[in-house]
Amino acid sequence: SIAGILNDKPIDTSMGLTPLEGLMMGSRAGNLDPGLVVFLGKKGFNLQKILNKESGFKSLVGKTDIQEIMKIGNKKSELALDIFVYKIVEYIGSYIAVLKGFDNLVFTGGIGENIPLIRKEICDSFGFLGLKIDKNKNSKNLEVISKKRSRVKVYVKKTDEELMIAKEVLNL
């Protein structure tokens, strides 16, 4: 998921009521035309199964693991990765517009923490805004991967979702 944050508070997120909205995932489509849901429903398809288990990377490449998809190297896998990066850039770009700029870009979660190529592709899209990453730092998954002269600081932050959930439960 992606969030636009202003003064330490999220102003928008890519997820809606369910994880179906937002970015394409391993087996989820992400944003789609509501008319498609109506069309498939009228045809008698199991929408729950299609939207949650058979969409996203799985529908394009037949696999859900992005590491495996990157190793395939054929036109389908390249298209799937291009779509994935494009949608991320689209979200970030819209948040930059709403926020009237950005100071930091933070990558986290499985893909954000562990796949330098995806981070590079995303960051390269914002080079025109003065965002510059250091290839060496990026390849090593260092905490700060932006160059010193970059107008935007780029971070790779490790997450521990289970710990965060446990802390929130203790606060109830």
Placement of each model-derived feature along the sequence:
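Glycine-rich phosphate-binding loop of actin/hexokinase-like ATP-binding domains
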Residues: 1-42
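Active-site proximal loops enriched in glycine and acidic residues that flank catalytic Cys/His/Asp
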Residues: 14, 73, 106-111, 158
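Conserved active-site and cofactor/substrate-binding residues in soluble primary-metabolism enzymes
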Residues: 31-35, 46, 61-64, 76-79, ...
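Glycine-rich phosphate/diphosphate-binding loop of Rossmann-like nucleotide-binding domains
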Residues: 41, 45-49
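Adenine-nucleotide phosphate-binding core of ATP-dependent small-molecule kinases
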Residues: 49, 53-99
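Glycine-rich phosphate-binding loops at beta-strand->alpha-helix junctions
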Residues: 103-126
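Glycine-rich phosphate-binding/hydrolytic loop that grips phosphoryl groups
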Residues: 134, 138-172
